[in-house]
From Swiss-Prot:
Transit peptide: 1-29
Topological region Mitochondrial matrix: 30-40
Gene giving rise to this polypeptide: Cox8c
Residues annotated as transmembrane: 41-64
Protein name: Cytochrome c oxidase subunit 8C, mitochondrial
Assembly notes: Component of the cytochrome c oxidase (complex IV, CIV), a multisubunit enzyme composed of 14 subunits. The complex is composed of a catalytic core of 3 subunits MT-CO1, MT-CO2 and MT-CO3, encoded in the mitochondrial DNA, and 11 supernumerary subunits COX4I, COX5A, COX5B, COX6A, COX6B, COX6C, COX7A, COX7B, COX7C, COX8 and NDUFA4, which are encoded in the nuclear genome.
A GO cellular component annotation in the UniProt record: mitochondrial inner membrane
Pathway as given in its UniProt record: Energy metabolism; oxidative phosphorylation
Native source organism of the sequence: Rattus norvegicus
Mitochondrial intermembrane side: 65-72
Stored SUPFAM superfamilies: Mitochondrial cytochrome c oxidase subunit VIIIb (aka IX)
Membrane topology qualifier: Single-pass membrane protein
Location of the protein in the cell: Mitochondrion inner membrane
Amino acid sequence: MSRLLQFCSSLLRHRVVLFSKPGHSGRLSHSESPQNQVLTPTESVVGIVVFFATFFIPAAYVMSNLKFFKGE
């Protein structure tokens, strides 16, 4: 086993990252199957609020201070 794979497996403990799997052109793959977890409504609401706040708060700041952002 190469040193990189030993290093990765020591970091991830139970997961080994395979860098060059035959038949896959350079894609990263894990040795475990993905865990399917359903999002709760609270997690969905938090995600949506963060998404919209990320875009609308800076836009609202620029719109409220538009006279300072205009080039004169």
